[in-house]
Amino acid sequence: MSLAEFDADVVINAQNCIVGRVASEVAQRALGGETVAIVNVEDAVITGSEEDVMSVYETRSELGSDQGPAYPSRPDGIFKRAVRGMLPYKSDRGREALSNVRTYVGNPYDDDGEAIDGTTLDRLSNIKFLSLGEVSANLGATVTW
């Protein structure tokens, strides 16, 4: 399905927002039947020290064999995988909800998107974080953003 065919009910800007908090809100909206587009996912952040965050993602990407499980290394794939983890994706209802979610590096829409209350980075006292773009670059993804 191309961008022209995906008419999103809601466009969410993930710039400087915490990945898990945005993903949980997106999962709830998708289960409610809305089509959701998330833009600027490369600028979404994961809290924690660089060593802790990278050890988790490096372990995930190294697990499995050539046949799987495969873990994404691009920021849009990592974000969509986080949303998938919050959905019952093995049921028809969850698969339908996941098909109503699109993630984008950059912003292909004319609309800047809305920021969800309570998900921005300025609510934290912890200053240790990594953006999804930095995580992807450290995992070896080709940087195109």
Swiss-Prot record:
InterPro entries: Ribosomal_uL13, Ribosomal_uL13_bac-type, Ribosomal_uL13_euk/arc, Ribosomal_uL13_sf. This protein is one of the early assembly proteins of the 50S ribosomal subunit, although it is not seen to bind rRNA by itself. It is important during the early stages of 50S assembly. Belongs to the universal ribosomal protein uL13 family. NCBIfam families: L13_A_E, PRK06394.1. One of its GO terms (cellular component) is cytosolic large ribosomal subunit. The gene is rpl13. Keywords: Ribonucleoprotein, Ribosomal protein. One of its GO terms (biological process) is translation. One of its GO terms (molecular function) is structural constituent of ribosome. Pfam families: Ribosomal_L13. Part of the 50S ribosomal subunit. This is Large ribosomal subunit protein uL13. It comes from the Archaea.
